[in-house]
Amino acid sequence: MRISPSETAMKLSLSPPPYADAPVVVLISGLGGSGSYWLPQLAVLDQEYQVVCYDQRGTGNNPDTLAEDYSIAQMAAELHQALVAAGIERYAVVGHALGALVGMQLALDYPASVTVLVSVNGWLRINAHTRRCFQVREQLLHSGGAQAWVEAQPLFLYPADWMAARAPRLEAEGALALAHFQGKNNLLRRLNALKRADFSRHADRIRCPVQIICASDDLLVPSACSSELHAALPDSQKMVMRYGGHACNVTDPETFNALLLNGLASLLHHREAAL
């Protein structure tokens, strides 16, 4: 992948288009903010699409000190500006958790640009259970620092049997996450933006086709949140994975990738046919 030449916008990683005028798919990760979250999807997506991934502002190769009132709307605006600076004006969005919120904001604020939205373990507004999970994680962060946050994170992302079979991998991932930790203040400001977001009054204004993917065994975000999202979005379809946890695209990429590829192809065709 090459880095966007824009010096004024966030850095983006773009795959070469597989053919002329190939559709663009933008991948938006969750609270961790790292574009590398989507590694299990890149090889299959870039055969059919030009793929954009990036480290969100305040994380990875887009370091910054975030304002206390940092918001989902700001996340959407800075991403759209970076895409336009890279010459991309129309794109599909695949967002995981916080990334799904950014995707909905993009669909509301830039409806002429967002062709299709895929929400992975997303929600309209934060569920009481999810809020409780984050309260526990925040307490760990305040009492034990970055290491406690990083060590607890897999418990909320992955199924227990998947973790038990991959202890060395989790240790390596934990060390990497700690080395590239986004910083306590940035993390809390991004988390507060997530907790404040509420699309319950505006979801019916999202007119692009939406694919909703959720995992029934997600510990962090109950699958009922995706059912609420499906009911609120006028043009949506919902797929439920029986296994995979919150990071189902990582733990069961074969199932997830098949759902994603079929959904993108169908919804992009549906969108073009409607124009």
Curated annotation (Swiss-Prot):
EC number, UniProt record: 3.5.1.-
Source domain of life: Bacteria
GO biological process: nitrogen utilization; uracil catabolic process
Keywords for this protein: Hydrolase
Recorded GO MF terms: hydrolase activity, acting on carbon-nitrogen (but not peptide) bonds, in linear amides
SUPFAM superfamilies for this protein: alpha/beta-Hydrolases (SSF53474)
Enzyme class: hydrolase
Cited Pfam families: Abhydrolase_1
Catalytic reaction list: carbamate + 2 H(+) = NH4(+) + CO2
Keyword Hydrolase applies: yes
Gene3D superfamilies recorded: alpha/beta hydrolase (3.40.50.1820)
NCBIfam families named among the record's database cross-references: RutD (TIGR03611)
The protein's name in its UniProt record: Putative carbamate hydrolase RutD
UniProt source species: Escherichia coli O6:H1 (strain CFT073 / ATCC 700928 / UPEC)
Gene: rutD
